[in-house]
């Protein structure tokens, strides 16, 4: 079976709550059952920092880039999670002050529904 797991965060690279724990534990568990697992993640800086052997596999156009700055799809390996990954690298969406979901004043980003 081939599995593509889409998630907003993954332990140990980016964690705000329990979602990251599950997202980090599920790929190895599925692989142990014989599945071919990949993950799809947003390009938050900690995720990009953990991505090894990254190569661009596609250029993305709006709405993926929210009409500013462009975006690209990277493929690489996340050794901290021992999983191959696709990462949406869109700096206008994911390189922000504050956390992944809210700004430095803890206000949710207005366009989270587009980013995630």
Predicted regions and their residues:
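Catalytic cores of nucleotide-sugar-dependent glycosyltransferases that transfer UDP/GDP/TDP-activated
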Residues: 1-116
């Amino acid at each position: 079976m081939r599995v593509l797991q889409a998630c907003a965060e993954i332990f140990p690279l980016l964690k705000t709550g329990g979602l990251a724990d599950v997202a980090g534990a599920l790929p190895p568990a599925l692989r142990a059952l014989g599945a071919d697992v990949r993950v799809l993640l947003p390009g938050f800086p900690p995720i990009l920092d953990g991505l090894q052997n990254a190569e661009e596999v596609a250029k993305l156009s709006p709405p993926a880039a929210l009409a500013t700055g462009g975006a690209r799809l990277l493929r690489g390996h996340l050794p901290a999670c021992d999983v191959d990954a696709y990462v949406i690298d869109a700096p206008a969406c994911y390189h922000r002050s504050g956390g992944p979901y809210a700004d430095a004043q803890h206000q949710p980003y207005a366009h989270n529904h587009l980013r995630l």
